[in-house]
């Protein structure tokens, strides 16, 4: 709270939160040990201070279920309507812990040595690529209906 107030007093006009999920189970499973309620409180506070606020949601974390994704959507109803939401699939990049998980699940490391349609691969351990893109579209549609998606 105090940091947001100081940021605003210093002239901060826009902030982007890497929330990733509003489902506590998912956050803890990927080492993001914070309470989604606190994230929502800070998002709402930023808006109330007049700071343009954006957050991201990531689809496709390992072990994430449909119920977890629905929980994130339901919880997003508790944040201010002026918060823009960016929805992405889970990318994997060398050096990240999720990259090591993908390798253990059979991701072919030679991907980086060949040409692909997508510069950065999506991790599809929890969902097929088509399912992931379907959920991204579903989430974007949900947020468009609330007039707060930012692509």
Predicted regions and their residues:
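A structural motif corresponding to the C-terminal lobe/cap of the Radical SAM core domain
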Residues: 1-150
């Amino acid at each position: 709270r105090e940091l947001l107030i100081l940021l605003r007093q210093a002239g901060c006009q826009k902030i982007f939160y890497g929330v990733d999920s509003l489902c506590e189970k998912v956050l803890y499973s990927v080492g993001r040990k914070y309470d989604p309620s606190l994230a929502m409180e800070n998002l709402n506070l930023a808006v109330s201070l007049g700071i343009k606020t954006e957050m991201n949601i990531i689809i496709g974390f390992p072990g994430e279920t449909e119920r977890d994704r629905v929980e994130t959507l339901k919880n997003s109803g508790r944040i201010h309507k002026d918060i823009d939401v960016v929805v992405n699939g889970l990318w994997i990049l060398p050096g990240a812990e999720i990259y090591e998980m993908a390798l253990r699940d059979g991701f072919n490391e030679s991907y980086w040595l060949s040409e692909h349609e997508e510069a950065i691969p999506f991790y599809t351990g929890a969902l097929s690529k088509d399912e992931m893109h379907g959920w991204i579209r579903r989430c974007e549609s949900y947020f468009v209906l609330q007039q707060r998606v930012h692509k």
